């Protein structure tokens, strides 16, 4: 199945969608305004973190020794419903998609692709897939996603599966910063190693762990812009930015396609 419109995959990190009380409805509402505008031209798939943080907010009295998988079990439905509620206000239908490495890397990836494209091509104005790594059921696979790049890698894989025109990784930074704290506007073969080194140094200096830091975002974005038969653009930008401006390369850091 081929999508009738170009696909955009937008990934929101946990810090962009949650606060101390769980999913942040006010910010989600603003993001959904952006999604509504974007859908006038593109088919949109969302990758959203936040299940674990939401579970912890819902169960504040639980021991710190409680496994993250348990918090994800508590929070995953609530996180999706928060998105669904705000999208429904825009008369946009949405559906939850929980994914593991197995479904992406095995032949089942084709099934996942067809299912997501079927949702986006639904005759009644499409359904927006809201994907998340299945932290509850996946052991080795989902844990690998979390330790390495959180949902960044998942978003990159989904963008490749769907043949997306754009992959947008949204964060709390204006883009990838150089040593002078200026946004690096474009990353390609000529400067990717230097950009990776800068992102790694900053992540270590600021105490960032191994989950979804800027280094991993740069790696995922660069790989995504080189992946597939029809590589697409990848972008890293601040979640508060206008998505149209990000896709038009007016704000953030951008990775041009190169087969």
What is the predicted function of each stretch?
Residues 1-259:
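C-terminal catalytic "cap/lid" subdomain
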